[in-house]
């Protein structure tokens, strides 16, 4: 789910920037910053988890939500930059935790299989993202370039609520 939500940056940002008459050439730079931000938390992930504790996933989702919001409401193309960075940082923190929780949950003999399923889900999100977005645009009768960011922001907010409500459960206990 998180993979699907953040894919709006890579799949839809150039179209949003073009619709707002921004330089679509700068979208490549912004997408590069997004991927750089995904990588960056890996250098200090243990410290981040120690600092944020059982609210790590909640704060990661908050970063994604604020980033999507900044991208959506941006009156200038350079306000999109912190949005891309926040989405990337949030994803860069939560994605390794998903793999870690998968290893903790699986029985030792099935760890590789469990990780393979997580990877399959990520690749399915990448494959299906455009179709899911198009389907919901059709349902809501909109062709807006902002729609993927608004829709994914709503999904992220609902997931944040779930993460907050269940922060003491095994799934969210880091």
Model-derived regions, located:
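Structural signature of the two symmetry-related core transmembrane helices
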Residues: 55-70
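Multi-pass alpha-helical transporter architecture, strongest
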Residues: 147-174
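Helix-to-loop junctions at the C-terminal end of transmembrane segments
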Residues: 40-53, 137
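A membrane-interface helix-boundary motif in multi-pass transporters
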Residues: 133-155
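Intracellular juxtamembrane helix-capping segments at the cytosolic ends
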Residues: 93-106
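Helical-face signature of the major facilitator-like transporter fold
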Residues: 3, 76-88
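A late C-terminal transmembrane helix in Major Facilitator Superfamily
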Residues: 103-141
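Extracytoplasmic gate region of multi-pass secondary transporters
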Residues: 1-32
């Amino acid at each position: 789910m998180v993979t699907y939500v953040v894919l709006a940056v890579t799949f839809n940002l150039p179209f949003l920037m073009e619709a707002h008459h921004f330089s679509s050439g700068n979208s490549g730079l912004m997408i590069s910053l997004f991927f750089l931000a995904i990588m960056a938390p890996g250098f200090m992930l243990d410290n981040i988890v120690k600092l944020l504790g059982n609210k790590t996933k909640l704060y990661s989702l908050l970063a994604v939500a604020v980033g999507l919001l900044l991208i959506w409401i941006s009156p200038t193309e350079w306000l999109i930059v912190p949005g891309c960075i926040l989405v990337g940082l949030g994803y860069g923190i939560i994605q390794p935790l998903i793999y870690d929780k998968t290893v903790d949950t699986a029985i030792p003999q099935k760890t590789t299989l469990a990780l393979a399923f997580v990877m399959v889900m990520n690749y399915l999100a990448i494959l299906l993202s455009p179709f899911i977005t198009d389907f919901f645009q059709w349902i809501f009768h909109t062709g807006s370039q902002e729609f993927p960011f608004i829709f994914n922001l709503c999904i992220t907010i609902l997931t944040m609520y779930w993460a907050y409500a269940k922060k003491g459960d095994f799934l969210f206990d880091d």
